[in-house]
Amino acid sequence: MMNWKKTALAGMIAVTAAILIAGCGSQSQKQDSQKMPDKIVIGLDDNFPPMGFRDESGKLIGFDIDLANEAAKRMGVKVEFKPIDWDSKEAALKSKKVDMLWNGLTITDSRKKQIAFSKPYMKNAQILIVRADSSIQTKDDLKGKVIGTQEGSSSVDALDKDQGFKNSLQDVKLYGDFVAALMDLEVGRTDGVLVDSVVGRYYMTKKEGKFRVLAGSMGDEEFGVGMRQDDTVLVNKLNSVLKEMSADGTMKKLSEKWFKTDITIPVQ
């Protein structure tokens, strides 16, 4: 009987050891899979000035482009920018067509359920823009009117949160990008545009005297970088680099380059 107990005990010890070894191996493999990549692919809407857009020669430029290039340099990785359908951005990230969403991406509770966000780095707001010669003076004056906005944007989320205002409108036209929406506003196809402040105000500087902003906003926001929820090493590394660039004045310098003022958030 004693020999049987010894044999059973030895067997249990062997099985336990095997499980522990397998567990260590699994943990090691998990850690290996979480190593920093040699290259990151950034998904963006390449018609989203001044965050990411193309100049007259077709070169990709903008605040987020400059910021992402500097971040990649400090992380020691190569970077590729890949234009995507912004309305399907979460799918592009999940399917690994891209590794990051970095293009004036608003942090929202609904998006947090699908993707991991970096720490916020910039302030934004949702604003209503009308033509300068319009009789519309307030948000309430848009009752029975047509406004435009970008499909899949946080402007749509802001509109959905204000059902009273949305239901008062005659129609809401959705566009592939804000620039197209603002162009339609300029020629009179719509009466107003709900747009990210950073985009709308930048566009207005290129069209002086054409537009004006209605008083107030439809919500304050913060921008962050979107990543896959299981890419914890990448998330942590980027947060560290963003904090560094915030502390050393790099973000402030880039913001002043593109916005003439510092609208970044101190990254903690």
Which residues does each PLM region occupy?
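Short, low-complexity disordered leader/linker segments with a strong preference
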Residues: M1-K39, I263-Q268
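Periplasmic-binding protein-like
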Residues: D46, K123-V130, S197, R201-K243, ...
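Acidic, polar ligand-binding/catalytic clefts
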Residues: N69, K78-D141
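Ligand-binding clefts/hinges and TM-proximal coupling segments of bilobed small-molecule sensing domains
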Residues: S26-K30, S154-K173, R212-L214, K243-Q268
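Extracytoplasmic small-molecule ligand-binding "clamshell" domains
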Residues: D32-G104, D248
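Ligand-binding cleft/hinge of the Venus flytrap
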Residues: R54, A68-V77, S155-Y175, M204-E208
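Extended ligand-binding regions for polar small-molecule ligands
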Residues: I65-R74, D140, K145-V146, E151-S154, ...
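A ligand-binding cleft/hinge motif common to bilobed small-molecule-binding domains
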Residues: L105-K113, D160-K161, D184-V187, D191-D220
